[in-house]
Amino acid sequence: YMRKQKNPQTEGSEHNRYANILNREFYAQKPMQKIVTDVTYIKHKGKWHYLACYLDLFNNEIIDYELSDTFDNFLVMKPAKRILEKAKSTESQILFHSDQGVQYSSAGYCNLLKSYNVIQSMSRAGTPRDNAVIESFFGRFKDVLRSHFQYWKCDDLQKVIDETVHYFNYIKPMRKLKRKPPVQYRLEQAA
């Protein structure tokens, strides 16, 4: 059972809003140019868990993610910081696009992105199509989690999430990537 909870309680009342700069242009010419992110909910063994993913629009690779049983700012900030630390040497600016969720609009998250000179973009309120790539990914991700990995039988949810991300990044071919998995496509484009 993986239905979203309505309005989970989170800390912080600040709510920054940013323009929809991505504007449904879900194509990137190179890695680390446009990153989309969102959080999904997974019920496992009677308890809600939260998965934040960051997806590179160049090749639809999940470049980082965080699984937690706590729906707080660290859920989205930990992977964002890891990505930005790795990308310090990137010459061009990176765009991060999200919905207007509390974590993505918090002062802590917005300040983190500013400190790395990231362009922040947000979907319009109530418009999930503005972040369609990650929304669609989560649908496929949960289908594979259910059917292929049968996550409900496993005691270690983190291990199953890791295996599912590995499957999407290294094994599952994508039509838009000439029938290659995301990591293989990225490596071949760099060669």
Predicted regions span which residues?
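Basic, flexible linker segments flanking DNA-binding modules
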Residues: Y1-K30, T127, P181-Q189
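RNase H-like two-metal-ion nuclease catalytic core shared by retroviral integrases
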Residues: P8-S13, S98-Q100, S106-A107, M122-K142, ...
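An active-site-proximal beta-strand-loop segment
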Residues: R24-I63, D69
